[in-house]
């Protein structure tokens, strides 16, 4: 079997394709969440606490000196990334919770199957034998 044929079979297996689709959708979802946090959530939050833009929060550890740029710790960007993470984690939690709920409904035990003719006959024979033993 040629390597190309083996690779094609490997790549077309359900799990690999599902994983690839999940990664692509996850990357797109991450961009949406980042935009939600940066463009929708953080501006009103900054306005509520005095018109502050979280991206601007930073601490300068060392000022620029000539050609050497300043060393700056941008903790505002970190705060925004924490919000991104929390929203993504909550969205994934809710999706998993919904999936588990749907799976639980599927897993509810089905009604016991009707007994076969043989089982019915054997049950009747057993009951008759019990009656005979009780009479004796």
Swiss-Prot record:
Gene: mscL
Gene3D superfamilies in alphabetical order: Large-conductance mechanosensitive channel, MscL, domain 1
All ranges on the Cytoplasmic side of the membrane: 1-16, 95-136
Bilayer topology annotation: Multi-pass membrane protein
PROSITE patterns per UniProt: MSCL
GO molecular function terms attached to this record: identical protein binding; mechanosensitive monoatomic ion channel activity
InterPro entries: Mechanosensitive_channel_CS (IPR019823), MS_channel (IPR001185), MSC/AndL (IPR037673), MscL_channel (IPR036019)
Organism expressing this protein natively: Escherichia coli (strain K12)
HAMAP family per record: MscL (MF_00115)
Transmembrane segments: 17-45, 75-94
Annotated compartments: Cell inner membrane
NCBIfam families given in the database record: mscL (TIGR00220), PRK00567.1-1 (NF001841), PRK00567.1-4 (NF001843)
Protein name according to UniProt: Large-conductance mechanosensitive channel
Gene Ontology annotations of biological process type: intracellular water homeostasis; monoatomic ion transmembrane transport; monoatomic ion transport
Ranges of the Periplasmic topological domain: 46-74
Pfam families recorded: MscL
Keywords: Cell inner membrane, Cell membrane, Ion channel, Ion transport, Membrane, Transmembrane, Transmembrane helix, Transport
